[in-house]
């Protein structure tokens, strides 16, 4: 698909509303400011935002040649504040967008942001944006933001290798192997305490569909599509396929046999690691970064727990090896037309964003200042922030407007570990066998209005089927309810967009 260029723009209606409740590093009411100042709105996930005097921020300003003024908004209320900002007319030069929310799509349709695809080719880093990820982050083929890179391949199975050794099994390679491992972790006393107090895999409560849940990953291994399949040239929902039902039947088997936690539908995801760390479960299906978290926690509990955790990228199923990819991005950085009024100003902001992707800028935003936040000896990175959170907060928030295009070049502390190397191998292998969502870039008005309601119908039916409240006919009835509640309308709209995108 070619990323299309938008040539005509609509004016965004402005309301006289004031921005409230945001912590920021400047007090000027002028959104345009001087040409030497770049104003940014970004979410704050840390307890503290970087101050105006942050050494990392000052070094970043020196490197980019711009004074950087950031309006920090608490992450929990970010989308609400975005809507207020868009109505106020008092906009910064760049706004971090977390997702394709209804408010963002409405603003795009009102012509609020620059369409960037004609300009990216003129910049050293931005010109190297991945075409597939650029498509995924687009709105029906039009690019309204510079995506923030995240690994395209993250999904994996995390497993306790000490338990594997104790039950006499090798690392699983197929779905059949996977089942046998979970069964052994339940029945063969993998922790050796003589008690029936372990199970195979822990799964938390998970909202949404096609967003990387353990169920999503396993469905791909079973051969189901990623959110939507293509049949006779048309999109179809994944949950209408035989492969999806095969996966769902497998999930129910795991539940019935006690191989997963009985409270999966309500378990707090913040406690997801605990059963593995505490020796109650032996498997999690999530991401490589979670594997590193668990390994670190286990070593903190007992220094002898070296290399206990390992990972497998994908398991061979009926259709061979397949893996669940991410969209390749986590939000994007947009440029409003009301504050960046001319092409000359646009190119100046793009030059700044391009420079933010240089290795030097990536290190400042993600690692901080050498000698203060970290040290580098013989090429080995060591953080100096472990016992000093205030040092971390000097730069942690700055990573919210780091894009890492064409690739991440900042330092990662565990890069010398066996787990990190396995993660790299999984990414390389996964890119060859990834099953992508063919509708990732498509934004349907029907889904914007009814998507949450429609998704909940399937989410509820999936849980009810797994725990035995409904059978296959009951699930089919839920699919019919989905269709009558707007699903048929959604598929008609998506297929129209899909045909136009080819």
UniProtKB/Swiss-Prot annotation:
Transmembrane segments: none annotated. A lipid is attached at residue 22 (S-diacylglycerol cysteine). It is found in: Cell membrane. This is Lipoprotein LipO. PANTHER family: ARABINOSE-BINDING PROTEIN-RELATED, POLYGALACTURONAN_RHAMNOGALACTURONAN-BINDING PROTEIN YTCQ. Residues 1-21 form the signal peptide. CDD domains: PBP2_AlgQ_like_1. The gene is lipO. A lipid is attached at residue 22 (N-palmitoyl cysteine). GO terms for cellular component: plasma membrane. Coiled coil: none annotated. Its main location: membrane. It is a lipid-anchor. Keywords: Cell membrane, Lipoprotein, Membrane, Palmitate, Signal.
């Amino acid at each position: 698909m070619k990323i299309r260029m938008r040539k005509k723009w609509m004016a965004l209606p402005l309301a006289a509303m004031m921005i409230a409740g945001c912590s920021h590093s400047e007090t000027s009411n002028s959104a345009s400011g001087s040409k030497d100042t770049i104003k940014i709105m970004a979410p704050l996930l840390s307890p503290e935002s970087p101050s105006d005097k942050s050494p990392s921020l000052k070094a970043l300003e020196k490197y980019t040649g711009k004074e950087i003024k950031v309006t920090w908004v608490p992450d929990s209320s970010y989308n609400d504040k975005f809507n207020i900002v868009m109505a106020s007319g008092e906009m910064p030069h760049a706004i971090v967008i977390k997702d394709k929310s209804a408010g963002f799509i409405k603003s795009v349709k009102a012509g609020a942001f620059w369409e960037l695809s004609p300009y990216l080719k003129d910049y050293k880093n931005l010109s190297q944006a991945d075409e597939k990820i650029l498509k995924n982050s687009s709105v029906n083929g039009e690019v309204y933001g510079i995506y923030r890179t995240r690994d395209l391949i993250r999904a994996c199975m995390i497993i306790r290798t000490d338990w594997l050794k104790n039950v006499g099994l090798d690392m699983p390679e197929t779905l059949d192997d996977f089942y046998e491992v979970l069964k052994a972790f339940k029945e063969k006393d993998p922790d050796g305490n003589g008690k029936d107090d372990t199970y195979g895999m822990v799964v938390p409560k998970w909202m949404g569909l096609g967003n990387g849940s353990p169920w999503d990953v396993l469905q791909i291994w079973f051969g189901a599509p990623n959110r939507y399949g293509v049949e006779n040239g048309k999109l179809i929902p994944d949950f209408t396929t035989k492969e999806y039902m095969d996966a769902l039947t497998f999930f129910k088997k795991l539940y019935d046999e006690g191989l997963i936690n009985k409270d999966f539908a309500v378990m707090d995801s913040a406690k997801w690691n605990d059963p593995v760390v505490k020796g109650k479960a032996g498997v999690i299906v999530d991401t490589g970064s979670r594997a590193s978290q668990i390994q670190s926690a286990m070593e903190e509990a007992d220094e002898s727990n070296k290399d206990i955790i390992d990972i497998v990228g994908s398991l061979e199923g009926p259709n061979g090896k397949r893996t669940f990819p991410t969209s390749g991005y986590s939000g994007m950085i947009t440029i409003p037309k009301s504050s960046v009024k001319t092409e000359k100003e646009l190119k100046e902001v793009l030059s700044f964003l391009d420079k933010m992707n240089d290795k030097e800028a990536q290190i400042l935003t993600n690692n901080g200042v050498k000698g203060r936040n970290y040290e580098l000896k013989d090429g080995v990175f060591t953080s100096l922030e472990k016992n000093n959170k205030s040092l971390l907060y000097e730069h942690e928030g700055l990573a919210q407007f780091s894009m890492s295009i064409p690739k991440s070049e900042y330092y990662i502390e565990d890069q010398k570990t066996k787990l990190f190397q396995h993660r790299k191998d999984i990414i390389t292998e996964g890119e060859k066998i990834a099953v992508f969502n063919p509708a990732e870039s498509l934004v349907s008005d029907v889904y914007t209005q009814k998507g949450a309601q429609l998704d909940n119908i399937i989410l509820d039916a999936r849980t009810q089927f797994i725990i035995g409240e409904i059978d296959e006919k009951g699930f089919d009835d839920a699919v019919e309810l989905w269709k009558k509640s707007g699903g048929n309308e959604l598929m008609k709209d998506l297929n129209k967009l899909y045909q136009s995108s080819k």
